[in-house]
């Protein structure tokens, strides 16, 4: 990091991504790059606690570059996904609900890299919570090599067919380059003053 690079005010980012590497080498390369960027920006990683695939790649990259990693994993996945025991903070919980709750509490923003059904479910859940006024934390979709293009088309179709109503648009930021993630989140945080959960809920209630 050069002397002119600004340190983000973000404390931690939750990253959703696959427990496999995917077929395109760009996925692992990008996960590694984002881990380096997080560490150099002094932003902690909150993630699913595994050591395999994109999950393991980003976590090890954060550690290799002197950053902090918080892994949160249910006990029944601790062997299947091979916990990353090198993480500074490794929390074993009872179930997926506790995992997602803690990941939410410990994070200032959310980023989704390529992944499978688990990644998609976690990402969409944050979009839903935001749409329902449960939080206003930035949610970023990293669209590596157009991986998420079909999902974006589906979201557009939902809007066109009236299932995502005007005023309840998805609170989602889409970026194509890993180096744009943190500036995009910082810009989003700076554009909106801090509001209470009650204020967010009151605004959303007028849309139904």
What is each residue range found by the language model?
Residues 98-133, 140, 191-199:
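Active-site/ligand-binding-proximal alpha/beta "capping" segment
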Residues 2-106, 146-179, 188-208:
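A cross-family phosphate/adenosyl-ligand binding-site feature
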Residues 116-118, 132, 145-147, 178-180:
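Short acidic/polar capping segments at secondary-structure boundaries
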Residues 136-145, 174:
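Short loop-to-beta-strand entry elements in the cores of soluble alpha/beta enzymes
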Residues 63, 129-137, 163-165:
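Arginine/glycine-rich "motif VI" loop of SF2 helicases in the C-terminal RecA-like domain
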Residues 185:
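Hydrophobic "lid"/C-terminal helical patch
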